[in-house]
Amino acid sequence: FMNAFLIASLLLDRRPPRMKPSRYPAVSILIAAYNEEASIADTLRSIANQDYPGAFEVFVIDDGSHDRTAAIVDACDHDWLRLLRQPHNAGKSAALNRGLAEASHDLVVTLDADSFLYRDALRNLVERYMSDPPNTRAVAGTMLVRNSRRNWVTKAQEWDYFHGIAAIKRVQSLYQGTLVAQGAFSIYDRATLVEIGGWLDCVGEDIVLTWAML
């Protein structure tokens, strides 16, 4: 039934096509990191390889890590990168709110410290946001399992991501009603984030944030 509904919705899709804007806006990227020494370098490398035509700034908020996360970020030589240190582990919401307070651009992207972006990911996300109706305040990025062919567990996770996240979000977007813009990769209107008070300190902070925007 889910697949049939998805196909029917795609055939009847009236969502505006994704267009290239005349000017790509500057964006602020927030990455909350806690003990992410195994992945943070790859995440930053994927950002450095983006083909995004506009400017961007990246804030890695080290949430009191006990490993080499902060040292790895500090060693990266990028003029768009800033490391913010939390004095102790206060949770992901507090880290993101710290980054939001420092962000200087009107569009804010959240990215997990173990997310890896395809080269065109940021450009596609911004184009989708800019092409949607003027009252759009957030757009969820596409999420895939990076190691989906490794074993049966990752294959099962890929299936869960497709039906539980990708397919459902695709259908919701056709009706301009995405219920969750996941924190792993989404874009938000900064003024709206500030207006609703940012991220609440709770489990599923991205869910609560999205619902506050609806």
Set out the residue ranges of the language-model regions.
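Long helical/loop segments within the catalytic core of UDP-sugar-dependent glycosyltransferases
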Residues: M2, S93-A95, R119-V203
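Short aromatic/hydrophobic "clamp" motif used to bind/position activated sugar donors
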Residues: V108
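Short, acidic, metal-binding catalytic loop of nucleotide-sugar glycosyltransferases
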Residues: R45-A55
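A conserved acidic beta->alpha catalytic loop
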Residues: D62-A71, H88
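Acidic helix N-cap motif at the loop->helix transition within catalytic regions
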Residues: S39-D42, D67-A75, D120
